[in-house]
């Protein structure tokens, strides 16, 4: 079992149950999935970009990546319907907890000029989204073998009913929030 999953079950869930005054352990908010998305506008001109992004994201997550395609043609962006424009991966269960553990303990401390995560990046339903400017903060990526620095979006989907519950959950996981 993943280290963070064990900590959640034994320490975080009982503490949150008391803190949020919930009657049942099943009511306690938990992280259900983590979605990583990499939008690749530059892939329009070069198909190699998609292959490199897929390889990077697969190294980071240890899971097969899905290529996303344009749903509509947009002349302003020079995009045609059906062209590959990004990659994404959804992590659940043990892989999700292992990724979250690596993100909090290894990757975020490697961010240059890191001052903490924005505590206002919740969506109103307890889900949290954050952006990473460079994929090289992950130890799985070899700096010498990357072709370009690419950012990615990380979304944590929780069972929290509102932002306050979601914030309490992520604070219990020791997320380094700014304010």
Swiss-Prot record:
Coiled coil: none annotated. One of its GO terms (biological process) is translation. Keywords: Ribonucleoprotein, Ribosomal protein, RNA-binding, rRNA-binding, tRNA-binding. The keyword Disulfide bond does not apply. SUPFAM superfamilies: RL5-like (SSF55282). GO terms for molecular function: rRNA binding; structural constituent of ribosome; tRNA binding. The keyword Ribosomal protein applies. Disulfide bonds: none annotated. GO terms for cellular component: ribonucleoprotein complex; ribosome. Signal peptide: none annotated. PANTHER family: 60S RIBOSOMAL PROTEIN L11-RELATED. Belongs to the universal ribosomal protein uL5 family. HAMAP family: Ribosomal_uL5_B (MF_01333_B). This is one of the proteins that bind and probably mediate the attachment of the 5S RNA into the large ribosomal subunit, where it forms part of the central protuberance. In the 70S ribosome it contacts protein S13 of the 30S subunit (bridge B1b), connecting the 2 subunits; this bridge is implicated in subunit movement. Contacts the P site tRNA; the 5S rRNA and some of its associated proteins might help stabilize positioning of ribosome-bound tRNAs. This is Large ribosomal subunit protein uL5.
